[in-house]
Amino acid sequence: QRQMCIRDRDIDLFSYCEHHMALMYDMKATVAYIPNGKVIGLSKIARICDMVGRRLQLQERIGQDIADIMTEITGSEDVAVVLEGYHSCVSARGIKKNNTRTMTVELRGSFKDDAALQMYLR
């Protein structure tokens, strides 16, 4: 049986850190899923990312929330979300490290153990 994977990459988003109310900026999301009989419009994935980022958040939770919504609307347990971005709470206050880019990865279903699928996220 043929297995199709759909991936949107470099989706721009931003949010605000719930700890410091500081901007998380230049964030890029990669969202992938293996359809379970239902394929959603590609713009929906970007809309989900925007919606989740528009509240006080942690980067880790953004990935989890996007994955939860993708699972709910597609019916697929095979979902992956990779987020990379800068945090002004790191670059503009405290330690002041401007080039520190944070990456979080949320892997579910087949993405957890399948190295080929994980390579597809790059």
Regions found by a protein language model. Give the residues of each.
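Short, small-residue-biased leader/transition segments that mark boundaries at the very start
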Residues: 2-6
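Short helix/loop capping segments that flank catalytic or ligand/cofactor-binding pockets
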Residues: 15-18, 91
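Histidine-centered catalytic/metal-coordination loop motif
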Residues: 19-64
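Well-ordered alpha/beta subsegment
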Residues: 50-86
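Short terminal or interdomain "cap/linker" segment that borders an active site or interface and mediates
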Residues: 78-122
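Broad gene-expression machinery/nucleic-acid interaction feature
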Residues: 8, 26-30, 78-80
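Residue-level signal for pocket-adjacent positions within structured domains
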Residues: 16, 40, 102, 106
